[in-house]
Each structure stands twice: as C-alpha cells, then as structure tokens.
Amino acid sequence: MGLEAFSRSAPLTLGVELELQLVNTNDYDLAPYADDMLRLMKKTPLPGSVVPEMTNSMIEISTGICHSCSEVLGQLTPIRDALVKSADKLNIAVLGGGTHPFQQWHERRIYDKPRFRELSELYGYLSKQFTIFGQHVHIGCPDANAALLMLHRMSRYIPHFIALSASSPYVQGQDTAFDSARLNSVFAFPLSGRAPLALTWEDFGAYFDKMTRTGVVRSMKDFYWDIRPKPEFGTIEIRVFDTPLTIERAAALAGYVQSLGAWFLADQPFMPAEDDYLVYTYNRFQACRFGLEAVYVDPAAGGHMPLRQHILATMDEMASHAAAQGASSALHLLRTEVEAGQNDARWLRERQREEQLLAEVCRQAAQRFRGLAL
C-alpha cells in the first residue's frame, strides 16, 4: 500500500487525544471497565469521540477540529464531565497521569479488537506494558511539504513537551527517578524515536515505499515516532506528552504547540538539518529524567543551558504569535509553573511524600481530574 495523499487542513487548527486511566474506588488500582464506560458514554451526544485503547482499563477521548486552545478546553470539558458522571454510575474513577503508579502489567487484559490482538501477538508482553497514558496533539499544516518542515522544527522542542507534561514518576509502586517514565516503555518498540529527515512529500514517500517493501511497515500507524505525519487529517501528530492530570493543562499544552507552529509559519526561524538530531536522544533523555530541571543542548550552537531557561526564552520569542492565536493565557499558565519548577510529576511526588500511600495519591489525582482544586 503506497503513501496516501496529504489532505488539506486549515493551518494551525488543533485536535487533542487523551488516554485516560479507569480505576476502582476501593484501592484505586486499574479496573477493566472500558466496555461499560463506552456503553454509557454512547448515550450522551458529545464533540469528538470516546474509544477503547490497548488494554481494558484504558479509554481514549478526543476533540474534533479546534481553532484555539480555548476551543480545545471547551470540547474537553463536556467530555470530561460525561466521563465523570458515567464513572460515578459504575463506582469507578477516571484520572490522568502518564502511568498508573502501582498497577502490575501482567494483570492487564488486551481489549478485544482486531488491531489490538494483532499487536499483542506481535509484541507479546510489551503490549500489556503499554498500559501507559499519553496526550497526542495534532496541528494542521498548509500542505505536505509544510507539514514535514513543521515536524522537524517541532523536533527541537520535544524536550519542552516532555518536561511540561511529565506526569509518570511511578511505575509498579516504585519512584523511577524519572519525571516521565512512560516514554521508556515506548523506546522498546522497533519503530519508535524520530522520523527520518525528509523535507518533501516525494522524498518521504520514497522512504515509506522502501519500508513497505521490507514488509516491516504496512501503514503510518506502524511508526511509533515522537512526531509523525497524519496525511488523512492534514496534520502532524506530536506524541510525547504524558497525559496531564487536568484538562486545563492539556488544553494549555495544545496552545503551546499552536503558538510554536504560528511562529514557525510566520518567521521561518531556522531550517532543520540532520545535525539537529545529534543531540536529540540526549535532550530527550534529560527531559524524561529531570523534567524542568533538565539540561538542554542547543542543536545549532552546541551550548548547554537549563531547559527551564530555554522554555522561558521560547515563550518570550513567540509571545506575539501566541496572542494572535488566543493562547496567551495558556502560555501564562505554563510560564507560572515553569518559573516555580512545578509539573504534574512534582505534584504526584509531593502528594506521596505527604500521604505515604500511592492509592491515596491516585484518589487525589482523580479529584483533580474532576476539576476540584487540591
């Protein structure tokens, strides 16, 4: 099957997907209630969609096409409210976060869907270990070549996305010392990491054809890249975000992506090059391990600086573009937390230090997802 044509989409439009945890309200471990939630959610007309995910203790929600991060929040809010209402009927809870803090992967069950069964047969235990929870942000691009240019420009900012969204410090009851341990599970898949540097759709199509001829790849879904083109939507899809603990942060992260995209389209600030990727894996590791306390290596100049400093400087650089997109409040929310060194991973660790019980941390995270201030 050849690479499909890149569809038209309005530049800088947004779409957001959130993978969410379903937990019981007894000990707050994961609960296999995806089918029941989907059945109840069908009764409420909502924007976007609600679908199953790899294992039956997960659910994915998504917005429709949005023109601003406030519209993203406007669509996520009724979906969240309907989820909470449905969960209450089932005596379960819904929460964000990139990993469940203490679930045991071997207890998971693959959701009964052909693609999930196929992936389970191919990847074995990795499929159950893939009970992790991410936010994906789609951004509309003017055309196929512009999409590839946008993709490789966004790649310099992967550490920003990781540190700002990091919410997975705990795995199987242990503090991993990572702010985003979730991405360590993605590394195990053979077609993860970065996309190849192709800046025209023709060159990308040639790469895709080579990969399909090997029999390794059948469609774009087989690539688990950090950012990948989504030709049927006319977007690129950024996939490194942990699912935040609140929909407000999820919408703000979408606003951050949109502001970057607006800056790229208006100012063309740099041309991507293969050498950008010399420090890609190192920067990615730093952000996963240390979050906002990471070191960032500038791919162009080679200089080292605190990642937090690079994020704040980037916010200053694109402030006028954020304002034009209606994303100033999103950047303000994120800036305040960056200046305080606060992300969701830190919040989870602070709660655990105080409570000394990860089940109680999950209970409080579920309250935060409901919209209650904690």
From Swiss-Prot:
Keywords: ATP-binding, Ligase, Nucleotide-binding. It holds the Pfam family GCS2. Its EC number is 6.3.2.2. Gene3D superfamilies: 3.30.590.20. GO terms for molecular function: ATP binding; glutamate-cysteine ligase activity. It is an enzyme of class 6 (ligase). It catalyses: L-cysteine + L-glutamate + ATP = gamma-L-glutamyl-L-cysteine + ADP + phosphate + H(+). GO terms for biological process: modified amino acid biosynthetic process. NCBIfam families: gshA_cyan_rel, PRK13516.1. Belongs to the glutamate--cysteine ligase type 2 family. YbdK subfamily. ATP-dependent carboxylate-amine ligase which exhibits weak glutamate--cysteine ligase activity. PANTHER family: GLUTAMATE--CYSTEINE LIGASE 2-RELATED (PTHR36510:SF1). This is Putative glutamate--cysteine ligase 2.
